[in-house]
């Protein structure tokens, strides 16, 4: 056999478990597995866990360069150069703390020309593409400087104008590096203009910037004082609901501008490219989840529930669920918010008024998760107990709720779920009998049996 035809045997420990190719810049994660740096960074941006061990790995977790393995790979490449193997180059040393601090100083020089600020933001974003740099940037306070920069961008000057050059890039960079929980606790309490700035962004046209803003808002409200969360400005709720409406329109192909934003990450870019490699569709999905989490948390208070119902949240949540079929987490959150909005009469009325309200809740029952089941049955219980009987009964018959509740009684599921299903069927039994499509014999039999929990 000729030397050229001889198959080259590559040592297994030279291969990246993700790409199955020779590693160019091997780094070891805290889980003990070594990957090529570029591959593991991309992986962690979408899935925060070790591909091999499944151990949780935050995006900012340490990636330790494996210099010895890299030298072994380089030595092996040199030895096999005559067989067509190209030597991997030594990766550049990531910029250190001094570089980051210098860029922060540039960022703070708000009075400089816009081009200077843009270059600073681009340099910071390039730094943030390296997983090791993100923690360093947080230690240096990049996130704090960026938030102040966003506030300045959205604040009116003496002429009543806003200098928004660099605003979109700042929001994207904040999304990339995140905000440490310790700082998130105090940012809103120390500067009330932050909330004003984020509210302003939510009412602008740029769809992606609104997505970044909602994720940022969730990060800030998650750890801050409950008093701030309880008294959020109605304009914030209006902006969040408007964002969800835009998402629904993009899925339903009625908003071309938004749809292009969602799809742009999958198309090759021409000309000047942005340094960020964030997947736009993933960012929007994260923003939808963040928006629902904000609504779920804030709807604990009656004042906020009334505001959300008046702003049309019930209808938009139902439309979102219809459009986002198959997204488990989004379904669970949506049902959670709806179950809280059902605590007020107007919320229950809105669910009944929407043609798909009871139908979509019924359809998700027993199809998603135990958490979704609990929230769906809670909605049906509240609506059936406190809404006009004639409206509830007819709607539940028409959309198959009665049959689904009978299925709950006959399935191996939670005892609490069965008891609530039985309660609904029992409360309206006399009305169900009037409908020829209802199997009264089966219904009577099911109601006579004591509910039992799942078999162990």
Curated annotation (Swiss-Prot):
Induction: By the bacterial elicitor flg22, and bacterial and oomycete pathogens. Changing residue 16 to A: Loss of autoubiquitination. It is an enzyme of class 2 (transferase). PROSITE patterns: U_BOX. It comes from the Eukaryota. Gene3D superfamilies: Leucine-rich Repeat Variant, Zinc/RING finger domain, C3HC4 (zinc finger). GO terms for molecular function: ubiquitin protein ligase activity; ubiquitin-protein transferase activity. GO terms for biological process: defense response; protein ubiquitination. Its EC number is 2.3.2.27. Auto-ubiquitinated. PANTHER family: E3 UBIQUITIN-PROTEIN LIGASE PUB24 (PTHR22849:SF24), WDSAM1 PROTEIN (PTHR22849). This is E3 ubiquitin-protein ligase PUB24.
